Regions:
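Conserved C-terminal portion of the radical SAM core fold
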Residues: 139, 160-179
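Conserved, mostly hydrophobic/aromatic
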Residues: 16, 36, 90, 99, ...
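N-terminal capping/small domains of soluble enzymes
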Residues: 1-84
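Glycine-rich, proline-tolerant flexible connector loops at the mouths of alpha/beta enzymes
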Residues: 42-67, 101-116, 147-151, 176-179
């Protein structure tokens, strides 16, 4: 492995935009993504395929993607999904390379973020693996609350390791440790 493969940079305008108190138009979001495509990030986490009722800032993700120009860029595009419907919608997007899913060792996090318990979340991961395999997409799991748990659920490095191992045994090749 050479030095250029040691660090991969992911830029995430999605993370910032979804917390804004207003909605940025799809045209402006696409223009921003197009500017980022020229920078050379390894991955751009551009948006989410979720209900616009849940996160109105991420509405019309497919429309945003339709306006993104990948010509001459090595950057991969990633979207986050919270369920199988979002995964199915994302998988139909030809410009999308990676589908991300927020998983956690915390039952409270899972309930608040994807309205699922651990068993349901694992079933979603299984379904997303099939969706991704059938559509030529990479699946990336975000192991949220990897560095601690503000909800007072049990957390330690052994619990984190157990969940990471479980994901690896499922065949997940990319796990991002997230706060």
């Amino acid at each position: 492995m050479n030095q250029h493969n040691l660090i991969k940079l992911t830029e995430s305008p999605r993370d910032a935009q979804q917390g804004l108190p207003y909605v940025i138009t799809p045209e402006k979001r696409a223009a921003y993504i197009n500017a980022l495509m020229k920078v050379g990030f390894d991955v751009i986490d551009f948006g989410s395929f979720v209900s616009p009722k849940a996160i109105p800032q991420m509405a019309e993700a497919g429309r945003v993607l339709s306006m993104v120009d990948k010509t001459g860029s090595k950057s991969k595009l990633m979207a986050i999904v919270g369920n199988l419907r979002g995964g199915s919608d994302a998988a139909t997007q030809p410009k999308l390379d990676i589908i991300g899913f927020p998983y956690s060792t915390s039952e409270t996090f899972l309930k608040k973020n994807i309205n699922a318990d651990a068993q349901q979340a694992e079933a979603i991961i299984d379904g997303l693996q099939q969706i991704c395999a059938g559509n030529g997409k990479e699946l990336r799991i975000f192991l949220s609350l990897a560095f601690g748990n503000p909800y007072n659920d049990a957390w330690d490095i052994d619990i984190l390791s157990k969940h990471t191992e479980k994901l690896a045994l499922k065949g997940i090749t990319t796990v991002t440790l997230a706060d």
